[in-house]
Amino acid sequence: MLKRVFLSLLVLIGLLLLTVLGLDRWMSWKTAPYIYDELQDLPYRQVGVVLGTAKYYRTGVINQYYRYRIQGAINAYNSGKVNYLLLSGDNALQSYNEPMTMRKDLIAAGVDPSDIVLDYAGFRTLDSIVRTRKVFDTNDFIIITQRFHCERALFIALHMGIQAQCYAVPSPKDMLSVRIREFAARFGALADLYIFKREPRFLGPLVPIPAMHQVPEDAQGYPAVTPEQLLELQKKQGK
């Protein structure tokens, strides 16, 4: 009896792993036509969306994923592949501001501040992609991130009827742990899209691109997110 239960458990685990692997491969296959590894092959679009991540690890070492995304954004902008850069990242806490950090580094690299737009409510990939259309009134854009992230972001875009392509910037050599976490992230994205039908945490007023944008001088300022929405989030975070 115990042996039968053990074998059944092994079969169940095996089927689950095969399902997760199959869904992972399906997502990669479905989005492959929209991913560009070479800048010269990338089509022109008015807006490039840079997906945020932390600049530094907790150890203080610079995050290579961040570095490659910023360099990719600089290359796409300087080559004329995009005219505007929408920096979408997490700013749920006043002490952590992904869009502002990206903005400072891009300006230091020569990007015109007037060509930079900030999205402080890109808490998840789904938020960033859907808000680009529903808040920033842009339905055809270039996503800038690593290939594995391109696949998930594009899958969300395709499901939502959003026309997007992705510029796949390099990944660090040692990315095994990140790739393993990506399995869970993709499974979560599928659940969000097909089961929970999730929308972005915040939407907010329409902020078309191009337009005149108020750019804050410090880590404050939350365009396209109302103060009431941010207060609600900070209460949930216990801040």
Curated annotation (Swiss-Prot):
It is found in: Cell inner membrane. Residues 24-239 are periplasmic. One of its GO terms (cellular component) is plasma membrane. One of its GO terms (biological process) is response to xenobiotic stimulus. It comes from the Bacteria. Residues 1-6 are cytoplasmic. Participates in the barrier function of the cell envelope. This is Protein SanA. It comes from Escherichia coli (strain K12). The gene is sanA.
